[in-house]
Amino acid sequence: MLGERGLWYKMHWFEMAARVPLLVHAPQRFAARRVKQSVSTLDLLPTLVELAGGSLEAGLPLDGHSLLAHLKGEGGHDEVIGEYTAEGTLSPLMMIRRGDFKFVYSEQDPCLLFDLRNDPRELENLAGSPAHAELFADFLAEARARWDIPAITGQVLASQRRRRFVADALTRGQLKSWDHQPFVDASQQYMRNHIDLDDLERRARYPQP
């Protein structure tokens, strides 16, 4: 977002932030096509498992669904479930995108319901529309059954307190950043006639202190 709706960055479920094209290139396996269904990156793992000839374990459920039907032009699901618990929101911000409709759910902000076919810019919130009252009620019931917002909020706040405690401790004495920073000595990283090639390759595969 670059100022649309007075918003910057993302941190919400409007199409300008949430809609990202997914490209699959496998010309020897699938004919070129464009699908209209909404899918998620959560669908990638089940797709790769099915492409590899594997099967999903009953005791290890996955949130996504295989995209093989989409790739073959045989239909496929049209649903995305989204969860946002980071900065820019007062409460966990959840989303159900199914078919033409998108429902955005929060305990602290008004719910949103959009008909993306007829309102692609998401300008008309149908949450209070009498004509969509039943659809709204169904989405709301599904969201409340799917997510325990008070429990999720409690987990988020507890995680924040733990991380703030550790961050404060790391600022005392010698500063230790949490940011991943691999320190590499370039003089020892490449072949520069200072070390036997076999030793260099061994160190590259099995780094030692």
Predicted regions and their residues:
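C-terminal cap/loop subdomain of S1 sulfatases and analogous C-terminal strand-loop tails that border
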Residues: M1-E4, F30, L42-D43, E50-L116, ...
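Histidine-centered active-site microenvironments of extracellular/periplasmic hydrolases
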Residues: M1-R33, Q37-S40
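Phosphate-coordinating loops and pocket residues in cytosolic domains that bind phosphorylated ligands
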Residues: E4, N125-G128
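A short linear boundary/processing microfeature
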Residues: W8, G73, S129-H132
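Generic structural signal for small/hydrophobic residues in well-ordered secondary structure
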Residues: P21-L22, L44, F103, F139
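Conserved short-loop catalytic and cofactor-binding motifs
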Residues: A32-K36, S55, A127
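Long, internal low-complexity/basic segments
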Residues: G128-P209
